[in-house]
Amino acid sequence: MSDISYREINANGFWHNNPGLVQLLGLCPLLAISGTVVNALGLGLATTLTLVASNVTVSLIRHWVRPEIRIPVFVLIIASVVTAIELAMNAFFHELYLILGIFIPLIVTNCAIIGRAEAFASKQPIPKALADGLAMGLGFTCVLVALGALREAVGHGTLLADAHLMFGEAARGFSLTLFEEYRGFLLALLPPGAFIALGLLIALKNIIDARLQKRQPAQAAVPVEAAG
């Protein structure tokens, strides 16, 4: 693992080992908060910051932490980072903080974060640990935002309806109304709808992977004409 390239790190985080689509970790906040794009983006960025900060810190102290106590130390680091992020969100994005509620401190229990600290950051130098945290966090955020966009569009007929919660009053104009006089679809906003939407995203990824795998043998089977 020590010779893993940055390209492989990015590919794993965004696609091959995506926390939301492949590992299926952090499903509680993934399904509960992804009702709108803004809520999903807020939680995704908070998770990304946690992954980056905890990965870098774990990599920095990896030579000084005894193996017997590494897990409690990693959890303490993650909890400290999440507490700082929670206080910052309460101060600067208070309305969004009230909506996300308990799911911000619950980031501490996200298995993807402790998993990356244990499996990757504790064995890698700081630059690669940072890259892994960024790739995994942004990959998770992309899934959250895609799920939020799908549920908000089907459930409310809008996109970015609460953009001002994150980007300020100037962002009220960002809201898009996709369907005029749309009465909404309640199922998309409930937990069963979240499971269905996530299942559709996973199915789409599997279809893309299957088609890519079919192309590779076909390309390898093409004979190479001899020169001359």
UniProtKB/Swiss-Prot annotation:
InterPro entries linked: NqrDE/RnfAE, RnfE
Transmembrane segments: 24-44, 73-93, 95-115, 130-150, 184-204
Main enzyme class: translocase
Protein name stated in the entry: Ion-translocating oxidoreductase complex subunit E
PANTHER family: ELECTRON TRANSPORT COMPLEX PROTEIN RNFE, ION-TRANSLOCATING OXIDOREDUCTASE COMPLEX SUBUNIT E
Membrane topology category: Multi-pass membrane protein
EC id: 7.-.-.-
Subcellular location: Cell inner membrane
GO cellular component terms attached to this protein's record: plasma membrane
Keyword list, A-Z: Cell inner membrane, Cell membrane, Electron transport, Membrane, Translocase, Transmembrane, Transmembrane helix, Transport
Domain of life of the organism encoding this protein: Bacteria
